Every structure is written in C-alpha cells, then in structure tokens.
C-alpha cells in the first residue's frame, strides 16, 4: 500500500473528480475542502472515526448547522473512498453521530419599523454599499445569500 497524507489524496481526488462533475460542483467541493477539510486533516495519514467525530463536534461548536456538516462529510467520504480504491488507504467504516438538538435557535427578523428606518437612512445617505443593502432588503435576501 502506497501511504499518502490526506492532503496528497485530496489533490489526486480533485484532479480525478474534475473530469466528471460540473464546474460549479467542483468549485463547491474545493471550497469545502479548503475551508474545512484541509485545515482539520491536512497532515493526517490515517483518518479515523474518532478524528472525524471530533471534527463534527468542533464544527458544531463553531456554529455550523448539521446540514452543512453533513455536506462536508459527504465530500470527506468521497475522498476517503477514492483513497481506498486507489490503494492509498485501508477501508475503514466511519459512523458519525450528531447530538440531538435540545433547543431551536430563534431566527432574528427585522421589524417593519426597523426595516423602514434602515431604508430611509440608505435613501438619504447614498453609497454603493448602502445601495446593496437597500437591494437586499427589498429582495428579502438572507445574510447567507448576500
């Protein structure tokens, strides 16, 4: 077996995957890898269930949603499967558990009065940044969509 670090396997996986997925999908994978997977597993030779479980708890503590973490884990498992298939890693089952949600986070929404005040301010103090804020308010965009 040709042992490689997680980072080396990622580079090979990306080169292989690029041929088969759309550019937007490849970009999404690359973003998840750069922002989450490489900082956590870059120098690791053996990605274990314990490491992945710790990674999940860390991401939850940082405020990522379970859905976002599950999306990251899908990419991680694709990379690990590729590593096994190519003979760089031994097959290993990784069963990650998520804690039950005890309390729902309250979504903060602007009141009509506050929205009106912001829109009046933006209209009287024009800048291109304020124009962007105005458009977002009028279109109903959420913070994560901006």
Segments the model singles out, each with a brief description of its role:
Residues 70, 85, 89-91, 95-143:
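Basic, Lys/Arg- and aromatic-enriched nucleic-acid-binding interface segment
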Residues 2-4, 14-82, 86-88, 104:
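N-terminal core-binding DNA-recognition domain of tyrosine site-specific recombinases/integrases
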Residues 1-2, 139:
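N-terminal intrinsically disordered, low-complexity tails enriched in polar/charged
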């Amino acid at each position: 077996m040709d042992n490689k670090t997680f980072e080396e396997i990622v580079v090979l996986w990306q080169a292989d995957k690029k041929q088969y997925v759309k550019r937007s999908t490849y970009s999404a994978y690359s973003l998840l890898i750069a922002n989450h997977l490489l900082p956590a597993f870059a120098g690791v030779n053996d990605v274990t269930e314990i490491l992945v479980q710790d990674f999940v708890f860390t991401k939850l503590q940082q405020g990522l949603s379970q859905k976002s973490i599950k999306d990251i884990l899908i990419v991680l498992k694709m990379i690990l499967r590729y590593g096994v298939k190519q003979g760089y890693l031994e097959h290993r089952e990784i069963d990650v558990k998520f804690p039950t949600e005890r309390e729902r986070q309250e979504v903060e929404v602007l009141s009509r009065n506050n929205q009106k005040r912001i829109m009046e301010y933006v209209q009287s103090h024009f800048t291109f940044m304020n124009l962007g804020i105005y458009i977002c308010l009028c279109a109903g965009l959420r913070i994560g969509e901006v």
